[in-house]
């Protein structure tokens, strides 16, 4: 069976991930007019820039959908976001600022929950608005087929007939008007935005050029912290975790995790926390650039890792970072539910996150400028009395340290011998002023 359909399957049911925007509206109307039977599915991901979710299915019905459903994905999205924090599943960082993989998390939830809803309705053909150059076309492909092995894919933006007729936003707008729908194009921004409750992605258009900065972006989850006219008073916030799960903000507990994430977004957003500018490698190995917002994810991540460093030993922390980066890349590639990702998630949640219990107090200022004011946990292995510089009882003596240093002579001697071995082969040069070989000064040698 052909998995990807290049042309519209006339007379068959097609499920379309319907956002209510111009692209999916025109695609739905066009498919109906050409003889397909479109079903519209809208994911409620708690997008901060969406004002009326209930109106979206109604519009889909007006444009010719056989049926239209609104699928509440918020609870599952927040659950996956918390899992990503517990595992440190983030691999794109620049200068210490992290991209929290909020779009990949959203695609994992959308791609599974919408296809599951389609399957309930007997719809086994899926279309969405992803383009052939991006990451989402592969993410949705993987998640869709994982959920429904019988799924076929039809994307209007891969259909030459659709492209020839409605290949641009201007053509789509004229098509909608000609069909009796007074659909006016929204004012074009200098970039495109995609968002969910966990974060927002700003990319493309002017942001494709590296001489365009965050200053052209209007945040939808925070504030322009770089603008001196925006007054942002400092704010103290306390985050409490129990067994790796965030349970309270400023002492307030929540009825569910969705409400907790919304409050974390409000707190972090007041300061512009979690904004970052990243150059990343897409799945197809081409580089792209995005500016990201994730105020709630950033707040929880900072507090989580503060507790992590005070509770776990160095080797465990090293494995957390290494496995977290590996898991983050799998998430980015649309492999969040693959066996290798599940293996990494299970080990990190079981052996790392389960011990993260405690409370962290921070002072938030402008953007990613913050201070940690206090860290409290019954699981802390940080014991200041062990290394105090003050006179008093100690868990080890000067003689103990002398013995420990003496044992180091073994590997120090081995290292010296290796350095001289490198010098003999020309990798290092001998120096009259030093007792050990040194790196060649390539500049002095004219290289």
UniProtKB/Swiss-Prot annotation:
Amino acids binding L-citrulline: 99, 135, 139, 192, 201, 203, 280
GO terms (BP aspect): argininosuccinate metabolic process; L-arginine biosynthetic process; urea cycle
Cellular compartments annotated: Cytoplasm
Catalytic activity: L-citrulline + L-aspartate + ATP = 2-(N(omega)-L-arginino)succinate + AMP + diphosphate + H(+)
Alphabetic keyword roster: Amino-acid biosynthesis, Arginine biosynthesis, ATP-binding, Cytoplasm, Ligase, Nucleotide-binding
Class in the EC hierarchy, top level: ligase
Statement: the UniProt record of this protein carries the keyword Nucleotide-binding: yes
Binding site for L-aspartate: 131, 135-136
Entry's Gene Ontology molecular function annotations: argininosuccinate synthase activity; ATP binding; protein homodimerization activity
Gene Ontology cellular-component annotations: cytoplasm
Protein's pathway: Amino-acid biosynthesis; L-arginine biosynthesis; L-arginine from L-ornithine and carbamoyl phosphate: step 2/3
EC number assigned by the record: 6.3.4.5
Binding locations of ATP: 17-25, 43, 129, 131, 136, 194
SUPFAM superfamilies for the chain: Adenine nucleotide alpha hydrolases-like, Argininosuccinate synthetase, C-terminal domain
Signal peptide from the UniProt entry: none
InterPro entries: Arg_succ_synth_type2_subfam, Arginosuc_syn_C, Arginosuc_syn_N, Arginosuc_synth, Arginosuc_synth_CS, Arginosuc_synth_type_1_subfam, AS_cat/multimer_dom_body, AS_multimer_C_tail
PANTHER family the UniProt entry points to: ARGININOSUCCINATE SYNTHASE (PTHR11587:SF2)
UniProt-listed HAMAP family: Arg_succ_synth_type2 (MF_00581)
NCBIfam families: argG, PRK05370.1
Assembly behavior: Homotetramer.
Family (UniProt): Belongs to the argininosuccinate synthase family. Type 2 subfamily.
Name of the featured protein: Argininosuccinate synthase
Organism: Shigella dysenteriae serotype 1 (strain Sd197)
